[in-house]
Each structure stands twice: as structure tokens, then as C-alpha cells.
């Protein structure tokens, strides 16, 4: 079985998120307008620190009750640590439960994150049987929420409810 990752916001992830993608030399070489944009973004990040991460779900995710998100062939895939690619899971995808029944992913990132018109599922997405996705085999791709900034109205909300 592939390594699994949760939505735990670790000190390592916080440090990674706080790291600038630009070196001091790159910033110094930028024009004043570009440096101003970077400074504004940094101020926003300090005012509204990350308070949660939401990993993107893929085939192979595990649910609280031991279900596994079934493989679906999609163009949109994420690279796993083992070098394999896994299709991104979306609302409506099937989860195979340990006793042989199936359930459907019922909640997603909503309009915050879509994949070819379908709502992307997340770790913490609920299933139509009350189960919940708790981990994913991919560690690199996630959404963040920030203190004081609300998520979209359809974020992790059952659609049609």
C-alpha cells in the first residue's frame, strides 16, 4: 500500500508555505511594481496565516471505515511518491467499502477547485453513506485556508442539500 497523508498542518508544511519562491537576489532585480506586489502578498499572508490544508483526493484515498476511492481514468493526475500517477478524485466518484458495498463522494472543494468541470474531492470529503475520506497517497498538492478569510459557500458542502 502507498504511503498515506492526512490534512495535518505540520510545522514543516507551515515553514514551506512561508518560504518565498524568490531569492533575495531575484527580488532585488525586479522592478518596483513587482516588489510592491510581493510585499502586499507577504503582508496578506502575515495578516491571514494558514489555518488548514486540504489535500486533493485521488484514486487510492482511504476512508474512516476502510473504503478506498476506486480508480477512474482522467487526464488530470497527480504524481505519487512511488513514481506512479493517480487520477484526481471528484464528487460523484465511487468508493469501494471493505464489505463490498459502494458509496459516492458527496462533498468537494466546490467552485474553489474544479477538474474539467467537476468538483475536486478532498481529504475530509464526505461520502453519501456518512463515511469520510481521511487520507490520500499524494502529498504535494493541497488547498489552504487562511485565518479570517472564508471559504466558498460550496466548500465541503453536500450539493443539492
Please identify what each model-predicted range represents:
Residues 1-161:
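Intrinsically disordered, low-complexity proline/glycine-rich segments
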Amino acid at each position: 500500500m502507498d504511503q498515506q497523508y492526512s490534512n495535518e498542518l505540520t510545522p514543516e508544511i507551515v515553514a514551506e508555505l512561508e518560504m518565498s519562491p524568490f531569492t533575495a537576489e531575484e527580488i532585488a532585480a525586479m522592478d518596483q511594481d513587482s516588489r510592491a506586489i510581493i510585499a502586499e502578498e507577504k503582508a496578506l499572508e502575515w495578516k491571514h496565516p494558514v489555518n488548514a490544508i486540504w489535500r486533493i483526493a485521488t484514486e487510492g484515498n482511504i476512508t474512516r471505515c476502510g473504503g478506498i476511492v476506486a480508480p477512474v481514468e482522467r487526464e488530470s493526475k497527480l504524481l505519487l511518491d512511488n513514481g506512479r500517477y493517480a487520477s484526481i478524485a471528484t464528487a460523484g466518484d465511487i468508493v469501494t467499502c471493505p464489505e463490498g458495498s459502494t458509496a459516492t463522494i458527496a462533498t468537494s472543494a466546490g467552485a474553489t477547485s474544479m477538474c474539467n468541470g467537476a468538483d475536486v474531492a478532498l481529504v475530509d470529503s464526505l461520502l453519501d453513506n456518512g463515511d469520510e475520506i481521511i487520507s490520500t497517497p499524494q502529498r504535494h498538492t493541497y488547498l489552504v485556508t487562511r485565518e479570517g478569510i472564508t471559504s466558498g459557500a460550496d466548500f465541503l458542502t453536500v450539493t443539492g442539500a
